[in-house]
């Protein structure tokens, strides 16, 4: 998992990462009681603003639209019907962007909303337009805030009875963030969730340890993946898939706990916080 001494130059390697994709999971944005974690939200926005002021480019992939829609509607349980899920997404997405706009405006940063479906990656013309738009936004010093367009997408909202092996370009924001990184030619993927990283089993079980570094995503590593949470769609398996996409493209990925204050600063300093995934080849 972690060859001796391999982490010694991690800080030096990460210092050279100038374009980052940061993915915020629903359980980072939302509290356990289903309300918005505003303090944590604004803290992460401040960290991103510092990265921008230090000359780094940031693309932010943000979950949370459905969770925010559920909050607005007073729902405690995730809806089972597709139309209800999409209604939650429509309500929550505007709320999500309003919070981002308020936070980043106070910090002197400009943002843009980018909503994607799998067709944006399948269709060559739409894909070319997407790449051009992201490049233009970054060139203007704008932070693209990217989310799957849940209101119109029909293949990625998991519902009871869904076939487990449906062919998808992406089915969650974890994998989407990996695809965004490769197509935007970014250097580092930061997956922020409510867990400390990849564990060698159930984190609550005795003797289970946090894995600080992974140099190859083997079947053993995949076996450590846990299930999904209640509000979001992603789990450890989808994060490993995102890490696989990124590392096979020659980039770094890290899974870290977005509840930890200043975790982004620690990640960008190359600290061994969370679980780091090393590139399989040179970028």
Which role fits each region the language model picked out?
Residues 2-78, 82-110, 114-283:
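C-terminal catalytic "cap/lid" subdomain
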């Amino acid at each position: 998992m972690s060859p001796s001494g391999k982490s010694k130059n991690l800080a030096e390697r990460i210092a050279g990462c100038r374009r980052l994709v940061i993915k915020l999971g629903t359980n980072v944005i939302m509290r356990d009681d289903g309300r918005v974690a505003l303090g944590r939200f604004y803290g992460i926005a401040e960290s991103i603003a510092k990265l921008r002021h230090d000359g780094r480019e940031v693309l932010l992939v943000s979950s949370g639209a459905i969770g925010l829609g559920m909050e607005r509607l007073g729902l405690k349980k995730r809806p089972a019907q597709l139309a209800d899920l999409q209604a939650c997404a429509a309500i929550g997405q505007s709320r999500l962007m309003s919070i981002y706009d308020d936070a980043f405006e106070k910090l002197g940063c400009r943002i843009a909303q980018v909503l994607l479906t799998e067709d944006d990656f399948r269709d060559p013309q739409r894909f070319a337009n997407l790449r051009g738009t992201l490049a233009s936004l970054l060139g203007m010093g704008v932070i693209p805030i990217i989310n799957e367009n849940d209101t119109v997408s029909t293949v990625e909202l998991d519902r009871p009875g869904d076939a487990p092996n449906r062919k998808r370009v992406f089915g969650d924001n974890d994998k989407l963030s990996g695809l965004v990184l490769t197509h935007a030619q970014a250097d580092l993927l930061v997956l922020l969730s409510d867990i400390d990283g990849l564990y060698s089993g159930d984190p609550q079980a005795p003797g289970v340890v946090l894995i600080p570094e992974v140099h190859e995503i083997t079947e053993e590593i995949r076996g450590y993946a846990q299930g999904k949470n209640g509000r979001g769609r992603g789990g450890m398996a989808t994060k490993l898939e995102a890490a696989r996409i990124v590392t096979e493209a020659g980039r770094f990925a890290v899974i870290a706990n977005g509840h930890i204050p200043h975790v982004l600063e620690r990640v960008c300093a190359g600290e061994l916080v969370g679980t780091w995934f090393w590139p399989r080849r040179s970028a």
